[in-house]
Amino acid sequence: MEKQIKIALAGNPNCGKTTLFNALTGSNQFVGNWPGVTVEKKEGKLKKHDDVVIMDLPGIYSLSPYTLEEVVARNYLITERPDAILNIIDGTNLERNLYLTTQLTELGIPVVIAINMMDIVRKNGDEINVKELSRELGCEIIEISALKGDGVMDAAEAAIRAAKGTKTVPMHTFSGPVEHAIAHIEEAAVHNMPEEQQRWYAIKIFERDDKVLEKLSIPTETMNHIEEDIKAAETELDDDAESIITNERYIYIAQIIKG
């Protein structure tokens, strides 16, 4: 029997994620709660594909550990490591939705993007250069209308292809000072991890993410060296590390949307 393929469905609240999940799985769903929390956990088998399980993650705006939903989604992605992520984004609100995308592509898990509500985008007379966006983000993009069911199986098939494809290595999208610090952190603290996971952890260490620092328990001496690197970037860019990452994500998104 073929190995089961796990695909995580991720996106902002109200982007059409639940509609897409229902379209992909039909009545073939299991609903429960995530361990230890009251956040609803939904998974289902892809229609006509018994070997493909779709996990509907809670709607989130980012992978920061600030809300229960974010913690649940993030824990699933970094500990369970699904075979692919199907990231549904609302085409009418591209900039805000891509903020999560930039974080998902750092996980070293293959990502496929489903741009939802493309019918409305066109109706509004707007245009999205899907080909250019796909090239910039390094992942396949499928246009869908979750409500009408257009393109939904194409999106699932693309996610299956991505899951069976080669390993993905995250792209470098930050400014020189940040990338310099991240490279040092990778070398100093996370070089023993699988290559595709190193960058995400290094970025989180740069942001001084409490949950990651707690999990990794980096030796004090190493952490002192890392702090020097972080502070150097903060001084050069005149902001705190977490704000620097946030701002640079939005700068990157603005650049790729302009195409």
What is each PLM-predicted segment?
Residues V112, R122-G259:
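Alpha-helical transmembrane helix bundles of large polytopic membrane transport and channel proteins
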Residues E69:
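Conserved donor sugar-nucleotide recognition element shared by glycan-biosynthetic enzymes
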Residues G32, Y66, N97, K123-D126, ...:
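Alpha-helix N-cap/helix-start motif
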Residues S27, G36, G59-I60, G91-E95, ...:
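Conserved nucleotide-binding/hydrolysis micro-motifs of P-loop NTPases
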Residues L20-F21, V39, I54-D56, A73, ...:
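Residue-level signature of catalytic and energy-coupling elements of molecular machines
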Residues L46-H49, V72-I141:
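Conserved C-terminal guanine-recognition region of P-loop GTPase G domains, centered on the G4
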Residues M1-Y66, T79-E80:
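Conserved G1/Walker A P-loop phosphate-binding module
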